[in-house]
């Protein structure tokens, strides 16, 4: 049966069906004849014909059943044949679609290869153009540094202090910046430069590469910055040996790049290695050692390990005090950083001590109008708030706003009031049923013109403090001024180079000869790296 073809099965079923139909007709005829015979037979002769008739009828029923079953089997077999044919059709379609899919994949792969080749050609042409500009700027930069190496050691404009936790990630005003989840933006170029080379003079050739790496890293172009650093490290170790200050500097830079990529383990290893080299080559009390310790503290702070960061920050403070003196502004910055770390651990007595000492240094050395004075007062106010010392916090907030107002608009008088005083008068007038006066409106407009993140933060914090005291009208006044100030100065800030501050821009300008257009094309990194390394005198 298994060897029979489908046609043989169909033919056999039809033959059986025809044979059963013929037998049914024959038995039906015999049955009718017997019924007629039984009717004409006497009663005593009837049993035999009736018995035959009964057998014929039984056989007829079986034949009818057999015919029906044969018809059903034939129908089922035909359906099975149809399903098999449909299945074969679907299989053929599937094979055809698979072939088409394979062809489309080949076409797509070929098109992608052509697209990549085209993009590489475009990128190569753009890189050639950029390379020529860089070569010109590098030559100009090197010519300038050779004339006076000492005066151009620092990368970009550097203020009195330039490698502290505040500049490397610990925000001076927003306490949330101390949380590890907040450090997602690339480190600004001037901050990375300061943190990497403080207290150590970088050779001109290495400084140029250093500036290029910093520029790429500040733009988030890590795929270019990292290979440049690694190539420079390899060449420096070949020419100068591993235990050399230049190697430590490049390790610092690469660590900061890794840190911005959230590769904290790699960054920590590099910083520890740089620290060991600097301690061995420069001594344990060198400012560059303090800078590396500070970078390690930042790294721990980014991971929320404030307890581990604190001793590193304290050691950096000791070095600065020893080298610079107890009342140097850099010492004040380090005190500010240490206070921020202690604040995140709830050590408020130490926080107050560090902030107050930093405030004394700033006021005595830099004057009451220095921005660091307002920042430190703001930080100290935040510490007071966390301890429930609302009166002390309020007094400091008012001092900040009063000094900012006097600096911008002159001596305080009845016609020239600071915004907090206007806010409190509005609170009093609200209870008396009086509206805002023209002087108050003018005061709001003046306050909104003060473009200072510290002042804006102070307005928000004092407004929150007023709300806690139930002074809702005064709180709304300060919040309104803060919002106006933000809206006024947002268009100005949005025109900056991707959020990089003026110091970063000037540093980049000195590095690339005034060209501020970032390289946004997906480039051939190896070609660019080799050209840059060759231009700088390194073996690629």
UniProtKB/Swiss-Prot annotation:
Keywords: Calcium, Cell adhesion, Coiled coil, Cytoplasm, Cytoskeleton, Microtubule, Motor protein, Nucleus, Repeat, TPR repeat, Transport. TPR repeats lie at residues 206-239, 248-281, 290-323, 332-365, 374-407, 456-489. Residues 34-138 form a coiled coil. GO terms for cellular component: cytoplasm; kinesin I complex; microtubule; nuclear envelope. Disruption phenotype: RNAi-mediated knockdown results in defects in nuclear migration in hyp7 hypodermal precursor cells. RNAi-mediated knockdown in a dhc-1 (js319) mutant background results in defective nuclei migrations in larval hypodermal P-cells. One of its GO terms (molecular function) is kinesin binding. InterPro entries: Kinesin_light, Kinesin_light_repeat, TPR-like_helical_dom_sf, TPR_rpt. GO terms for biological process: axon extension; cell adhesion; establishment of meiotic spindle localization; locomotion; microtubule-based movement; nematode larval development; nuclear migration along microtubule; polar body extrusion after meiotic divisions. It is found in: Cytoplasm, Cytoskeleton; Cytoplasm; Nucleus envelope. Kinesin is a microtubule-associated force-producing protein that may play a role in organelle transport. The light chain may function in coupling of cargo to the heavy chain or in the modulation of its ATPase activity. Recruits unc-83 (within the unc-83-unc-84 LINC complex) to the nuclear envelope during nuclear migration to mediate the link between the nuclear envelope and the microtubule cytoskeleton in hypodermal precursor cells. Oligomeric complex composed of two heavy chains and two light chains. Interacts with unc-83; the interaction is direct. Interacts with unc-33; the interaction regulates unc-33 neurite localization. Interacts with casy-1. PANTHER family: KINESIN LIGHT CHAIN. The light chain is composed of three structural domains: a large globular N-terminal domain which may be involved in binding to kinesin heavy chains, a central alpha-helical coiled-coil domain that mediates the light chain dimerization; and a small globular C-terminal which may play a role in regulating mechanochemical activity or attachment of kinesin to membrane-bound organelles. Belongs to the kinesin light chain family. This is Kinesin light chain. It comes from Caenorhabditis elegans. The gene is klc-2.
């Amino acid at each position: 049966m298994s060897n029979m073809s489908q046609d043989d099965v169909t033919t056999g079923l039809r033959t059986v069906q025809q044979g059963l139909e013929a037998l049914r007709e024959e038995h039906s005829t015999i049955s009718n004849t017997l019924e007629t015979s039984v009717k004409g037979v006497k009663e005593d002769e009837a049993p035999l014909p009736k018995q035959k008739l009964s057998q014929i009828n039984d056989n007829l029923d079986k034949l009818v059943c057999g015919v029906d079953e044969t018809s059903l089997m034939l129908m089922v077999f035909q359906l099975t044949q149809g399903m098999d044919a449909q299945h074969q059709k679907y299989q053929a379609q599937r094979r055809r679609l698979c072939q088409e899919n394979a062809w489309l994949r080949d076409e797509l792969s070929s098109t992608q290869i052509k697209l990549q080749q085209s993009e590489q050609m475009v990128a190569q042409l753009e890189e050639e153009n950029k390379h020529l500009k860089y070569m010109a700027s590098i030559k100009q930069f090197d010519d300038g540094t050779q004339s006076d190496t000492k005066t151009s050691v620092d990368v970009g404009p550097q203020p009195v202090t330039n490698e502290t936790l505040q500049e490397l990630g610990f925000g001076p005003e927003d306490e949330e910046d101390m949380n590890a989840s907040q450090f997602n933006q690339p480190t600004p170029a001037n901050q990375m430069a300061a943190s990497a080379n403080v207290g150590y003079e970088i050779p001109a050739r290495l400084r140029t590469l250093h500036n290029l790496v910093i520029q790429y890293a500040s733009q988030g172009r890590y795929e270019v910055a990292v290979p440049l650093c690694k190539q420079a490290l390899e060449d420096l170790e070949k020419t100068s040996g591993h235990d050399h200050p230049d190697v430590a500097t490049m390790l610092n830079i690469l660590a900061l790049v890794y840190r911005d990529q959230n590769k904290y383990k790699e960054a920590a290893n590099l910083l520890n290695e740089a620290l060991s080299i600097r301690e061995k080559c420069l001594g344990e009390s060198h400012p560059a050692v303090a800078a590396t310790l500070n970078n390690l503290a930042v790294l721990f702070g980014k991971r929320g390990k404030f307890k581990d960061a604190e001793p590193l920050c304290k050691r950096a403070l000791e070095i600065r005090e020893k080298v610079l003196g107890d009342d140097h502004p850099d010492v004040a910055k380090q005190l500010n950083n240490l206070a921020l770390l202690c604040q995140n651990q709830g050590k408020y007595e130490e926080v107050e001590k560090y902030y107050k000492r930093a405030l004394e240094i700033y006021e005595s050395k830099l004057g009451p109008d220095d921005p660091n004075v307002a920042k430190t007062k703001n930080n100290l106010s935040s510490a007071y708030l966390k301890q429930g010392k609302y009166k002390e916090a309020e007094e400091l907030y008012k001092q900040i706003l009063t000094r900012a107002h006097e600096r911008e608009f002159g001596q305080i008088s009845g016609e020239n009031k600071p915004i907090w005083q206007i806010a409190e008068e509005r609170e009093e007038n609200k209870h008396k049923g009086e509206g805002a006066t023209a002087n108050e409106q003018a005061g709001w407009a003046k306050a909104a013109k003060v473009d200072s993140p510290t002042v804006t933060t102070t307005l928000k914090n004092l407004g929150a403090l007023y709300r806690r005291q139930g002074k809702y009208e005064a709180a709304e006044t300060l919040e309104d001024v803060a919002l106006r100030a933000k809206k006024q100065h947002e268009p100005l800030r949005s025109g900056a180079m991707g959020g990089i501050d003026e110091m970063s821009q000037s540093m980049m300008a000195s590095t690339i000869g005034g060209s501020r257009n970032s390289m946004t094309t997906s480039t051939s990194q190896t070609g660019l790296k080799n050209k840059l390394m060759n231009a700088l005198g390194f073996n690629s």
